């Protein structure tokens, strides 16, 4: 991980800030669609700060520059930021949030600026309130992104790749039925229309996929759904005859950038009593519906706070609960993916013990090569985290060719990887050791494993959130005074983004807002990290399902989890003496299931077959 000299970039930005009469400039990580993962052209925060992690916010004044990020990236940010930057370690005691830091810098009547397309309306409203409480003047939406001006001709071009139709045998539901579900929400709210701006929601809604953002099968677009019409805002050059036929005459196609002008016009017509249609919602004066992730710019175009109602997207909520076709596809692709990981780990162990020098990138490339032979493979779902020894302590470590470590067979190796398949998306982490682990490594691994098992075995009543379950995964680490600085679980899309909401398992308060429901796929990934020494993480994907219980208190159904990931744990790192009989039974049962579902992919006496049999032998 190299450090970038940001001195000249900051100097240019500060000159532009003077031109715009902005004292504090905010640079979020997200793009205009509030995407967690972005294309190279939208990596503005990374460009100005040098920090390449997926989460964080940069703030620049005439005298200071600060980067705020969460615990997943403390080590990485410390390595990548140069001397121009102050690192704000989000969540630590006495460390301000980026919003608090902005408000502090705005004291004394200063102006704060931001590109209104890359901050949500809710974030902008909250930030402006903080600024004014501290004596700042206002939050300004700057029309042109100042980072783009600093970047100039070196800024990468925005992708404009073709879109593909996802067959119903993978999606499980015709897209007009999905749109009708949105219209029911409009009817319930007496709303004249809903703007869909999240890229994965649009891809899911129309049963389309793309390649505009690496590892995420999405495409740049917006959608607008009214009680009578559906409009997709997209560059028409992305659509071939098959896609156009798939959408049919019921979907109007408009240029991508015209969304702002057209919804502004619709908003003006509605304001003066000339709605687009004769819909009852328009007559009743209902508000436009926007999701809580809609940009400030879009919200302002619709008329601002008085004209919009911010809701959790009904598309996001329906997408999170997989239908029967999606559930079966996710299970199948995880079995194939598990077989690929077994083949990879068997190969890696054999090569390392023979003395072959393999670096982290070479190993990751080999894993991708093995995966690519699998049925329905469409690419990776994120950059493979292939990390040896102390690099494994960097939670979202990204090895780079020519600047990475050779895998040490005497050290821990952490591999967090996933793939995109037509029938689903995978994300699996395994921590291995090819030599003799230390007592601390074995104890740490076993404590993490115990937490993962506890969450996997949980049974809970309807209405329970991931916030309530998070302690199950941390309890054994906490009992030793240990912990990890990341969430325990995130939602997973079906041939879509590897991270999806609106639910999750973790300590963030927003995880208390959405209950876990049958059909949701979520990761179970506790970990432990010793800076400069080693890192441990174990991750399975699990599916929420209804379970039978001997009683039903409150006449509520009870839920549990079904195991989806099929990859052995590392026997060498398990201290069996720390496991209870119930945990040992769980482990042996899981390994029996892994063997049963994946051994058929290998020749009887192959390297992978022998490795699988050894690693799944009961303890």
UniProtKB/Swiss-Prot annotation:
Record note on cofactor: Binds 2 manganese ions per subunit.
Residues the record lists as binding Mn(2+) 2: 416, 427, 539
Keyword Hydrolase part of the UniProt annotation: yes
Listed cofactors: Mn(2+)
Protein residues bound to Mn(2+) 1: 427, 525, 539
Keywords, sorted A to Z: Aminopeptidase, Hydrolase, Manganese, Metal-binding, Metalloprotease, Protease
Pfam families documented for this protein: Creatinase_N (PF01321), Creatinase_N_2 (PF16189), Peptidase_M24 (PF00557), Peptidase_M24_C (PF16188)
Catalytic activity: Release of any N-terminal amino acid, including proline, that is linked to proline, even from a dipeptide or tripeptide
SUPFAM superfamilies recorded: Creatinase/aminopeptidase, Creatinase/prolidase N-terminal domain
Keyword ATP-binding applies: no
Molecular function via GO: metal ion binding; metalloaminopeptidase activity
Listed EC numbers: 3.4.11.9
Enzyme class: hydrolase
GO process terms (BP): proteolysis
Gene Ontology cellular component list: cytoplasm
Entry similarity comment: Belongs to the peptidase M24B family.
Function: Catalyzes the removal of a penultimate prolyl residue from the N-termini of peptides.
Protein name: Probable Xaa-Pro aminopeptidase P
């Amino acid at each position: 991980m190299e450090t970038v000299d940001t001195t000249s970039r900051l100097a240019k930005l500060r000159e532009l800030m003077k031109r715009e009469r902005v004292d504090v400039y905010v640079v979020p990580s997200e793009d205009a669609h509030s995407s967690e993962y972005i294309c190279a052209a939208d990596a503005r925060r990374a460009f100005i700060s040098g920090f390449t992690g997926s989460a964080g916010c940069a703030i620049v004044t005439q005298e200071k520059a600060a980067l705020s990020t969460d615990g997943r990236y403390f080590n990485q940010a410390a390595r990548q930021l140069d001397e121009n930057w102050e690192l704000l370690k989000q969540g630590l005691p006495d460390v301000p949030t980026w919003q608090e830091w902005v408000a502090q810098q705005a004291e004394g009547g200063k102006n704060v600026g931001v590109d209104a397309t890359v901050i949500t309306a809710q974030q902008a409203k909250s930030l402006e309130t903080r600024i004014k409480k501290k004596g700042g003047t206002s939050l300004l939406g700057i029309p042109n992104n100042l980072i783009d001006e600093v970047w100039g001709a070196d800024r990468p071009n925005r992708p404009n790749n073709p879109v593909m139709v996802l067959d119903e045998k993978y999606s499980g539901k015709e897209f007009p039925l999905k749109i009708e579900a949105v219209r029911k929400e409009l009817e319930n709210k007496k709303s004249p229309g809903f703007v869909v701006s999240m890229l994965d929601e649009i891809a899911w809604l129309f049963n389309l996929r793309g390649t505009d953002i690496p590892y995420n099968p999405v495409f740049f677009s917006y959608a607008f759904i009214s009680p009578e019409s559906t409009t997709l805002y997209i560059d028409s050059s992305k659509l071939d005859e098959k896609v156009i036929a798939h959408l049919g005459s019921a979907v109007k196609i408009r240029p991508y950038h015209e969304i702002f002008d057209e919804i502004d016009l619709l908003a003006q017509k509605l304001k003066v009593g000339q709605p687009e249609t004769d819909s009852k919602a328009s007559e009743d004066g209902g508000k436009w519906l926007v999701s809580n992730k809609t940009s400030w710019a879009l919200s302002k175009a619709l008329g601002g706070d008085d004209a919009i109602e911010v809701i959790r997207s009904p598309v996001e909520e329906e997408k999170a609960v997989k239908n029967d076709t999606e559930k079966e596809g996710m299970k199948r692709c995880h079995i194939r993916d598990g077989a690929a990981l077994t083949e990879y780990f068997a190969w890696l162990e054999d090569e390392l013990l023979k003395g072959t020098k393999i670096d982290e990138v070479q190993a990751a490339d080999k894993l991708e090569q093995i995966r690519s032979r699998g049925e329905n493979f469409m690419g990776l779902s994120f950059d493979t985290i292939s990390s040896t020894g102390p690099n494994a302590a960097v939670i979202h470590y990204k090895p780079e060719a020519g600047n990475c470590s050779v895998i040490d067979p005497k050290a821990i190796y952490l591999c967090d990887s996933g793939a995109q398949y037509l029938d689903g998306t995978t994300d699996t982490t395994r921590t291995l050791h090819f030599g003799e682990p230390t007592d601390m490594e074995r104890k740490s691994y076993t404590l993490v494993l115990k937490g993962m098992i506890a969450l996997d075995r949980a049974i809970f009543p309807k209405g329970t959130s991931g916030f309530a379950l998070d302690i199950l995964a941390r309890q054994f680490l906490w009992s030793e005074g240990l912990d990890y600085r990341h969430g325990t679980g995130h939602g997973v899309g079906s041939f879509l983004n590897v991270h999806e909401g609106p639910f999750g398992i973790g300590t963030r308060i927003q995880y208390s807002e959405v209950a876990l429901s049958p059909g949701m796929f979520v990761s179970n990934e506790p970990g432990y990290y010793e800076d400069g020494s080693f890192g441990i993480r174990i991750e399975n994907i699990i599916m929420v399902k209804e379970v039978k219980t001997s009683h039903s208190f409150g006449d509520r159904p009870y839920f549990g989890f079904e195991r989806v990931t099929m990859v052995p744990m590392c026997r060498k790192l398990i201290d069996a003496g720390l496991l209870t009989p119930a945990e040992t039974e769980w482990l042996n049962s899981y390994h029996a299931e892994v063997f049963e579902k994946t051994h058929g992919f290998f020749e009887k006496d192959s390297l992978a077959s022998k490795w699988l049999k050894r690693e799944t032998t009961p303890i």
